[in-house]
């Protein structure tokens, strides 16, 4: 049965759900209009300064970014949508291939209702086999295959988008965990100063205004803590939505490979970036459509067979009462003139190809800009980290001096409160700076198409689709 079916219908390709990156990336990008991509780094060092980037000790329940990304891509509905579209497009290839196979049709008709033949019924069966068409069917198949490659590239784009969304959420969640910890320390520190101010005011050592001022600072720090906790909970809820379970008791880990495998000091491979692959696939679709339009000018040769049986009346094919007739013939057909539509379609296809090529260049330019922005961010954040660490030491020493001077009465409680705030402000800036570096790195990983390598998604079945490097 399977062998017989293969004679009359095309065999579907069951490998559409395996994305071959070598095949998708088998093209060159013309970057002559732009400068070369920058290699991020400084002339003095070939390593990223990760001082101060150590994480909280893991607890009994720890998840890292790679594990979270794998969970998210397995359940994200937009990836499901793209994969369903991929399967649909694979079926469209079979639709195009069907033109290679015999086309059977049949029906029953009556005679001319305005003549004496109106009582005739004619049963007919027709078979048509395309013999030669100058490659028109092949061009239709090529269009559908190019669209399949485009759909595969769009699946990769969506996987990278989800991976970036998860990684960015984890980085920001870790950021606000640290910021909330520092904000709580600030509340505790100011509360201690307020307690001391109350004791001194009650003892008559200092002004009664000191406790009021301390209370104002305490309330401001408490308000800041609530604001930071709100941001933390927002990212917790975002991750909960992406992963599908409560993540409040999970300790998130940012693995070192986010830094080491981001290849921040290496030029990216442009033709392996999903957005570039998608744009190039659109070029291939436009080229195939142009080829199909050009071939539509040529004739098609078909082998046509017919069977007809008059059920009542005369068979018009042989003029016999209740007659049976059969015939086999060659038939050549061509569209000679359609009001200039073929020429217009050819021009439209040419413009579509140029537009698709421009989209490749635009995608490259966007990537170029993003990488250069990341270069500046990472370079300056590393320089800023050194200043912030020095400031942290200075503010700590300042607070110690102000405490001694406050005891001696040469400093006001406001000076002491400002010193306390300065310490925690410096600590917050260090943490924000640290996680800004991480945020830029995960953005770079996505921009340069390295998400599948860094988060170990290659050769992993993602909702039935496997990415093969």
Feature map (PLM): residue ranges:
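Amphipathic alpha-helical coiled-coil segments
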Residues: 81-96, 158, 162-187, 192, ...
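Membrane-embedded beta-strands of outer-membrane beta-barrel proteins
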Residues: 125-127, 330
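Acidic, low-complexity, intrinsically disordered peripheral segments
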Residues: 1-35, 55-57, 247, 429-469
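Periplasmic alpha-helical coiled-coil/stalk elements that build and connect Gram-negative outer-membrane
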Residues: 26, 158-272, 374-377, 381, ...
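Short, solvent-exposed, mixed-charge loop/turn linkers that connect secondary-structure elements
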Residues: 48-49, 56-58, 226-272, 300-302, ...
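Small/polar (Gly/Ser/Thr/Ala-rich) solvent-exposed segments
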Residues: 80, 103-119, 131-157, 277, ...
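Regulatory alphaC helix of protein kinase catalytic domains
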Residues: 40-71
């Amino acid at each position: 049965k399977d062998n017989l079916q293969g004679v009359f219908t095309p065999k579907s390709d069951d490998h559409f759900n395996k994305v071959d990156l070598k095949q998708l990336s088998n093209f060159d990008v013309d970057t002559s209009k732009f400068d070369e991509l920058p290699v991020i780094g400084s002339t003095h060092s070939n390593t990223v300064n990760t001082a101060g980037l150590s994480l909280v000790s893991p607890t009994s329940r720890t998840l890292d970014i790679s594990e979270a990304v794998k969970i998210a891509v397995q359940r994200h509905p937009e990836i499901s949508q793209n994969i369903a579209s991929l399967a649909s497009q694979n079926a469209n290839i079979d639709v195009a291939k069907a033109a290679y196979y015999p086309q059977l049709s049949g029906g029953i008709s009556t005679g001319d209702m305005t003549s004496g033949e109106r009582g005739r019924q004619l049963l007919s069966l027709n078979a048509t086999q395309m013999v030669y068409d100058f490659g028109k069917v092949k061009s239709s198949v090529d269009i559908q295959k190019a669209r399949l490659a485009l759909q595969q590239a769009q699946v990769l784009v969506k996987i990278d988008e989800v991976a970036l969304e998860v990684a960015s959420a984890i980085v920001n969640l870790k950021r606000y965990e640290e910021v909330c910890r520092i904000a709580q320390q600030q509340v505790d520190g100011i509360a201690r100063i307020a307690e001391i101010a109350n004791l001194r005011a009650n003892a008559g050592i200092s002004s009664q205004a000191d406790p009021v001022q301390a209370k104002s600072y305490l309330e401001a720090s408490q308000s800041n803590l609530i604001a930071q906790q709100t941001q933390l909970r927002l990212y917790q809820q975002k991750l909960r939505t992406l992963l599908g379970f409560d993540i409040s008791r999970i300790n998130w880990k940012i693995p070192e490979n986010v830094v080491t495998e981001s290849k921040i000091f290496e030029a990216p491979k442009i033709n392996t970036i999903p957005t570039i692959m998608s744009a190039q696939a659109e070029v291939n679709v436009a080229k195939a459509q142009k080829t199909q339009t050009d071939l539509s000018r040529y004739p098609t040769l078909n082998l046509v067979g017919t069977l007809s049986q008059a059920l009542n009346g005369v068979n018009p094919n042989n003029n016999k009462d209740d007659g049976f007739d059969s015939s086999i013939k060659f038939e050549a057909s061509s569209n000679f003139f359609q009001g200039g539509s073929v020429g217009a379609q050819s021009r439209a296809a040419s413009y579509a190809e140029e537009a698709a090529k421009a989209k490749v260049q635009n995608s490259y330019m966007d990537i170029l800009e993003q990488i250069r922005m990341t270069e500046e961010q990472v370079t300056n954040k590393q320089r800023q980290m050194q200043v912030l660490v020095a400031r942290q030491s200075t503010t700590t020493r300042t607070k110690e001096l102000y405490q001694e001077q406050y005891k001696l009465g040469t400093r006001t409680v406001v000076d002491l409160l400002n010193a306390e705030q300065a310490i925690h402000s410096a600590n917050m800036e260090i943490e924000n700076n640290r996680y800004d570096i991480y945020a830029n790195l995960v953005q770079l990983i996505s921009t340069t198409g390295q998400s599948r390598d860094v988060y170990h998604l290659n050769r992993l079945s993602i909702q039935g689709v496997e990415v093969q490097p």
